[in-house]
Each structure stands twice: as structure tokens, then as C-alpha cells.
């Protein structure tokens, strides 16, 4: 996956687990509800605007989306979710950053600590891992979809910070404030993105070999299955060869 690999990219290699589990709606509903606390008008609420876009891309029914917004604004009763980050270490000292939405912080922390302990990981103190990540807009494009010079010109003109060339993908990195402008510029140029999100990108990555890679992927899958984990980030890199070997047995 060239340079650094993102958990979201690894998940696509594995067959979009979220979709199969039906978790994607749950996550988007929580994101919409929380975003709507800052106002129901997407024009004045960038976070809600992005959440609504995700909901539409996932073909969420309009009524479901409307109710999620109304729960956020207080028009409808709903669960009060708290947002927070948890930090952990995986096999080989890999840093893991978890974005959480929970209606019971103590329960969530206890459950995730238990999952970590059972899967070659452990909880870290606040700040121990987060410094290893930068918040960035990330857009990936399959290399066959566009030539490098065209992508560079469009992305950088729209405000992108960098374009990285991987083995199979281009990765466009932006400041979070310029993410929407870059995404729109690519869409206007009919350049299809495989992934487009504001995420936490590792400053550096640690390459994992077969056993540690297998343990790390298993840990990430287990954490990802927890209902309160909205997003996962980790600073590991796994070669395409290891991923291909794993796909053949998954």
C-alpha cells in the first residue's frame, strides 16, 4: 500500500466489513445526531454537511436521516452520546487511536480494555499515542483512474497539501479546512475517489511482518466490531504480499 497504510484501506482489502455487518448506518446515525447539536442547517454546519453526504452515499432512507437530525437538535428524544478518544498499544508497540461515541464512558472503557488485553494490546494513557497522528483530509484515488500530473494540478490548485504515490493508490492529503474544496474539485473533474474523509494520519509508520501483522489485524477487527468505536487509526504498515496472503484465507 506504499508509504503508510490506513485502517480504512486495509478494511477495503478485506471486503468492507462494515457494510456486511450493517454497522455503517449505526455509525452514520450517531455522527449525524452529534453533528446536529450544532444546528440543523447543513449550510452553516460543515460537520453535519459531511455527515449527511455520508448518509446519502450509504443510501440511508430520508426518514432515518431526518430523525437522526431531530434527535440531535432535541426535537425528538434520544440517547445522549459523549464523544471522546481512547489511546492504546497493539502488538509491536503500534499506536492505536480510537474515536468513541458512548452513552456510558465507564462501560465502554472497561469493555475495550478487556478486548485489548485478550488480543495482544493494552490501554495507554491520554496523550501517549495521539501525538503520533495529525488530523488531515484524506482522499485516495486508484492509479488507473487519473494520471499523476493531472491529479497534482487539480488537487494542489484546490488547496491540497500533498499527493503521495503508492503502489496502487494516489493519496491526497489536505488541511481539514480545505477538505471539502479539494473533494469538490476532484468531483468536478470527474475523478472518482475510493476514500474521502477527515481522519487521523500517522506521522510515521511501523512495518509489521507476518505474525505481528496477523495479530494487529485481528486486534483492529475486534475493536472495530465494538458498537461505540466510530473510527480507528493506527500507525502500522503491512505489505501487499501479506494482505494478499491473508485475503486467501479470510
Residue ranges of model-derived segments:
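Glycine- and Gly-Pro-enriched alpha-helical subdomains that act as flexible
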Residues: 107-181, 189
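N-terminal cationic and glycine-rich segments that engage phosphates or anionic surfaces
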Residues: 1-124, 129-138
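Short, hydrophobic beta-strand segments
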Residues: 51-52, 90-100, 131-144, 164-168, ...
Amino acid at each position: 500500500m506504499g508509504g503508510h497504510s490506513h485502517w480504512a484501506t486495509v478494511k477495503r482489502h478485506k471486503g468492507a466489513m462494515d457494510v456486511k455487518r450493517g454497522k455503517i448506518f449505526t455509525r452514520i446515525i450517531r455522527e449525524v445526531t452529534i453533528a446536529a447539536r450544532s444546528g440543523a442547517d447543513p449550510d452553516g454546519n460543515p460537520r453535519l454537511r459531511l455527515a449527511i453526504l455520508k448518509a446519502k452515499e450509504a443510501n440511508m432512507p430520508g426518514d432515518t436521516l431526518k430523525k437522526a437530525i431531530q434527535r440531535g437538535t432535541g426535537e425528538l428524544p434520544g440517547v445522549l452520546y459523549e464523544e471522546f478518544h481512547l489511546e492504546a498499544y497493539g502488538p509491536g508497540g503500534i499506536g492505536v487511536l480510537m474515536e468513541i461515541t458512548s452513552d456510558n464512558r465507564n462501560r465502554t472503557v472497561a469493555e475495550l480494555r478487556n478486548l485489548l488485553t485478550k488480543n495482544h494490546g493494552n490501554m495507554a494513557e491520554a496523550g501517549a499515542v495521539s501525538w503520533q497522528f495529525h488530523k488531515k483530509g484524506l482522499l485516495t484515488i486508484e492509479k488507473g483512474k487519473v494520471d499523476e500530473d493531472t491529479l497534482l494540478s487539480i488537487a494542489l490548485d484546490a488547496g491540497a497539501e500533498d499527493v503521495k504515490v503508492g503502489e496502487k493508490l494516489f493519496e491526497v492529503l489536505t488541511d481539514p479546512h480545505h477538505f471539502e474544496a479539494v473533494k469538490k474539485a476532484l468531483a468536478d473533474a470527474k475523478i472518482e475517489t475510493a476514500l474521502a474523509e477527515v481522519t487521523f494520519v500517522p506521522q510515521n509508520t511501523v512495518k509489521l511482518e507476518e505474525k505481528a501483522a496477523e495479530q494487529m489485524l485481528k486486534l483492529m477487527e475486534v475493536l472495530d466490531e465494538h458498537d461505540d468505536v466510530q473510527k480507528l487509526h493506527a500507525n502500522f504498515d503491512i505489505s501487499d504480499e501479506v494482505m494478499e496472503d491473508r485475503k486467501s484465507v479470510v
